[in-house]
Amino acid sequence: MTSIIEKPEPNFNSLHDFYLNAAHKIHNPDRAVMFYKEKGKWEQLTYQDILDGVEQLGAYFMELGLQKGDRVALMMDNCPEYYVIDQTIQKLGLVNVSVYPTLTGEETAYIINDSSSKVLFVGNAFLFKKFKKVEGDCATVMKVVVMPKDLEQGEKFTDYTSVLVEGEAFKDKYASAVAERFASVVKSDLSTFIYTSGTTGMPKGVMLTHYNFMSNCYDAKDLCPAITSDDLYLSFLPLSHVFERLATMYLSTYIGAQVAFAENIDKVAQNIQEMRPTLMAAVPRLLERVHDKVYKSATEKGGISAKIFLWALKVGGEARVKRNEEKMVGPLLAMQVAIAEKLVYSKIKAKMGGRLKMFVSGAGALPVHVGEFFANLGMRVQEGYGLSETSPLVTVNEFHRQVYGTVGRVAPRQMVAIQDIETKKILAVQTYDTFEAKYASEEGEILVKGPNVMQGYWNRPEATAEVFDEEGWFHTGDIGKFDRGYLRITDRLKNMLKTSLGKNIYPTQIENVLLRSPKLEQVFIIGDKREFLTAIIHPSMDELKSAFGGRKDYFEVSDPFIQDEEIKKWMQDDVKKLSENLAKFERIKDFIVKREPFSVEAGDMTITLKIKRKVVMEKYADEIEGMYA
């Protein structure tokens, strides 16, 4: 029977041990570890600066009487303070409960209450105002710490600066108690509750231990030895999400890399130029936008420059295929690649700061053409796969072997199985050590075993029992198969549409085909229990304005859908052409044109930019019915 071969790993007991090792053994305490922008200027913090903050905050927590296992909630955007707070939590054996800043007040109150959080950190005045509206519903919170000074003071409220000042005064008093507490923290202790921002239902608190994350860091480093202590991450995805927490916070700490916090999502391009990162974690939708902008900028004016760009893409594609097939890149092709590098690739890389080794893509399916596009330009996008429940990494494309359309090789400390959806028979089991480059399997639900798999859902024993079987396999709810030795994701099982004619359809695959059109920004496929498929499509506003001009009646009316038949015909041309790549039963018969994009703010997307199917189906039920009338 297939089993996991034990791998050597460092002797660390906690995530705070990672930090101490980086500060004292990989580097020294005076090395800059973190960069952030304040009042238009990039500032830095050293390892010692962070350690000082952890010491002060730790003493403050002890004065509050926090016990091992108590929960501390963080409702804040990415910032150095988040790092200090989290390291203090890990050192004292507390539990980080991160609340997405985009959640409603009611959702925030639900998470605080469900976790019984005793302390809440709030990042800004806007978030504080949101909390104040539901404060009365958060009975377990005994102290609220706000980042800005002078928002509100009192027995229950204070500000972060005051907390550090108080902690400094308590340091000597609690020095031995803090040391004893830290010594008591072990790998199996809880580190965090990650509340899933799923597309259906109330969020569940995923319980992850120190070792869940630690083993995942060991796996990530083993799968990608190219990441080193000289790297600089640019962090812009929310640390509330497990993907960014692992990739930017814990993995960077483990290897001793530096982190720069982007100002916000709109400033990422500017911040890349300023900080010149070597590594970035990104979700597929953001990479799609980069692809669209680069392609449009290079080709829209036509002429010789557009021809050179397209030639460079072609040459890069030929070289990519050769390398993936482990064939020699001949002298003529190598010379063409060198010319393309000088004329095209280097200029695009310079806009990415000039030092970027790779993007790490996760939290959703990366369209094949987007991954290949970056690879053709000599830039790596390493797509991986995981969930909050798996800390998150399960598989990732290896640095030396990229197979776009797959999510890579099984991590060294894990097992992945494929189970038939109907019969529940195990169709395949793979580990890192059983890897074969030509291995393929049938399709089914993806199951996972390993030290990265969660302990369960907080306060939800029934929900926990639903996702673990008698053999200890965690059922991911994702459909996939092995292809060329790597895992390939088809879709979420709950996303599967079954037409009234009995056809099983996975909408994400169809959506990704149609999204190859630069005219289409978002596609949402409909068809469960229907005779045929339809869609809600949001067009690219840049392309729309370019094609039809800036007429206000397209963009500034109350109707959520654009009724103009000329615009629909303009989009239909691309839909029809791209649908030639689909089976007849996968082609949409009709669609409606959504004026505004699906968004997190509107409540119809998750924080990782996945459309919430149930929400959209309910929100636009009448318009959807109209397509089937």
Locate each region found by the language model.
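Conserved C-terminal "lid"/linker of ANL adenylate-forming enzymes
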Residues: 497, 522-525, 569-629
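Conserved pre-ATP/AMP-binding loop-to-beta segment of ANL
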Residues: 30-32, 168-195, 202, 226-232
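Conserved AMP-binding/adenylate-forming core of the ANL superfamily
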Residues: 33-79, 83-87, 104-109, 159-164, ...
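Conserved AMP-binding/adenylation subdomain of ANL enzymes
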Residues: 214-232, 239-345, 355
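Conserved ATP-binding/catalytic segment of the ANL
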Residues: 434-499
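Structural core segment of the AMP-binding/adenylate-forming
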Residues: 64, 91-166, 570, 576
